[in-house]
């Protein structure tokens, strides 16, 4: 039976780099929020153990694709049999992409989290969110927040999560044809890595910033130009390591008014924030139907 699952985009409302570990990973303080916008993932269970990605991404091999890696990681787990017993552990996976790749919206991590949650259900496993988050962390630091599906303040490498209440806001997200590698930004020698750690209450009361933004603006002139352009209408920041930027509004119409003015070669969308991610809502619906 074919099933379609949400794979939402996230924004980093702020992002501060507070240090670097001996293993190279960076210590962060960031606030994740979810948008009512994202990819759609269709999964068809197979009667064998093949994992087939029906919509490959250019320049990414099948075996290295995060979605395939997520499915195989779960496939390798002993599992917990549900009342239906042992089910086939294969799948055909298709992704309808709306979230730009290399944009800082968490598209790959979100896709991986959706696959872990969906296959956990479809294969009759019974792993908890906490157990899936541990698996997800092996795939990427952002995967756990998509597993839990709540707006959250993150510390550590992004894996220590504290749920946060976030008001309903509207966001204009803009981007060009630039794609940015997270690894490249975090390895840049000019990246600020010593922002003092602060309490969440202090961070929420202070102006929001992204420590990656100065480096990204310097290395990618198109991002710099876009941030300069939108500043005539509204404050804007980078999300993640870019290349997407965003502005916050109280109403949808305010955001759409600016979207209509964007220069040629600039793309974007308008979406509202949501306290619970669209993916988590999907699973709450599934659980209510089962019960």
UniProtKB/Swiss-Prot annotation:
Coiled coil: none annotated. It catalyses: 4-CDP-2-C-methyl-D-erythritol + ATP = 4-CDP-2-C-methyl-D-erythritol 2-phosphate + ADP + H(+). GO terms for biological process: isopentenyl diphosphate biosynthetic process, methylerythritol 4-phosphate pathway; terpenoid biosynthetic process. Pathway: Isoprenoid biosynthesis; isopentenyl diphosphate biosynthesis via DXP pathway; isopentenyl diphosphate from 1-deoxy-D-xylulose 5-phosphate: step 3/6. The active site is at residues 10, 142. Keywords: ATP-binding, Isoprene biosynthesis, Kinase, Nucleotide-binding, Transferase. Its EC number is 2.7.1.148. ATP binds at residues 100-110. It holds the Pfam family GHMP_kinases_C. The keyword Lyase does not apply. It comes from the Bacteria. GO terms for molecular function: 4-(cytidine 5'-diphospho)-2-C-methyl-D-erythritol kinase activity; ATP binding. It is an enzyme of class 2 (transferase). NCBIfam families: ispE. Catalyzes the phosphorylation of the position 2 hydroxy group of 4-diphosphocytidyl-2C-methyl-D-erythritol. Homodimer. Belongs to the GHMP kinase family. IspE subfamily. This is 4-diphosphocytidyl-2-C-methyl-D-erythritol kinase.
């Amino acid at each position: 039976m074919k099933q379609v699952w949400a794979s939402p985009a996230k924004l980093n409302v702020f992002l501060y780099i507070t240090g670097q570990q001996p293993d190279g990973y960076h210590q962060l303080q960031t606030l994740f929020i979810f948008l009512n916008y994202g990819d759609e993932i269709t999964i068809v269970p197979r009667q064998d153990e093949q994992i087939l990605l029906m919509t490959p991404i250019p320049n990414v091999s099948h075996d290295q694709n995060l979605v395939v890696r997520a499915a195989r990681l779960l496939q390798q787990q002993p599992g917990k049999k549900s009342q239906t017993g042992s089910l086939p552990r294969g799948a055909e996976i298709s992704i309808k992409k709306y979230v730009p790749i290399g944009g800082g919206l968490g598209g790959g991590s979100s896709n991986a989290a959706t696959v872990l949650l969906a296959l956990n259900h479809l294969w009759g496993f019974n792993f908890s969110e906490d157990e899936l988050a541990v698996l997800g962390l092996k795939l990427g630091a952002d995967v756990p927040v998509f597993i839990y599906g709540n707006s959250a303040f993150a510390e550590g490498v992004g894996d220590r999560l504290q749920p946060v209440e976030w008001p309903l806001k509207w966001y204009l997200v803009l981007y060009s044809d630039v794609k940015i590698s997270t690894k490249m930004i975090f390895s840049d020698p000019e990246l600020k890595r010593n922002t003092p750690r602060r309490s969440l209450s202090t961070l929420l009361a202070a102006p929001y910033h992204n420590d990656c933004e100065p480096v990204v603006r310097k290395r990618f002139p198109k991002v710099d130009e876009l941030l300069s352009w939108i500043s005539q209408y509204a404050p804007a920041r980078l999300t993640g390591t870019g290349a997407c930027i965003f502005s916050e509004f109280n109403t949808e119409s305010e955001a759409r008014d600016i979207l209509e003015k964007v220069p040629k070669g600039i793309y974007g969308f308008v979406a509202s924030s949501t306290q619970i991610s669209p993916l988590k809502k999907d699973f709450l619906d599934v659980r209510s139907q089962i019960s």
